Amino acid sequence: MAAQRYRPNRIRLLLVAESPPEDPARYFYSEDARSTDPLFDAVCEVLFEGERADKTTALKELKRRGVFVVELKPDSPRGESKLAAYVAPFLINLETLGPEQIVLVGDDVHAAAYRAIDKAGLPAVDVKVPDPAAGDQASFRNKLRQALVRGGLEKLIKPLPPSARAKV
């Protein structure tokens, strides 16, 4: 699976999205250069301060910085499923990942999982970061920055190294 190739040894920031997209080409870890994923684009825009890189280079840089993305409902697109049913198994997996900070992406994900993660003593940042796929990119960028600062991870926000920048 592509995500495992980009899993950092030490996860500093774990972003928890709702579920994988229906179109596999829109998956966060899809290496297809033509793929477009609103979450991937928005995360890179914040963490790389707007600088562009090809997708594989950006994925490698996210791994180097300790950033990893998982889904609360990892098996298939959500559809009409209740996310609360996925929280207990998710908590078991969280302990094996050992993230320094957890940021929940999307109001439904936050509503379903934040209290349980916090009650389990895991390091969840209590900032409601909207899903960028819902169309509010500006709010996503602001809230993700806020979550990074609250979680003590503001140093993750920095330009790409010169060797990783896209050639224009």
Stretches with model-predicted labels:
Residues 1-132:
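A polyanion-binding, active-site-adjacent surface
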Residues 123-168:
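Charged phosphate-binding loop/patch that engages nucleotide di/tri-phosphates or the phosphate backbone
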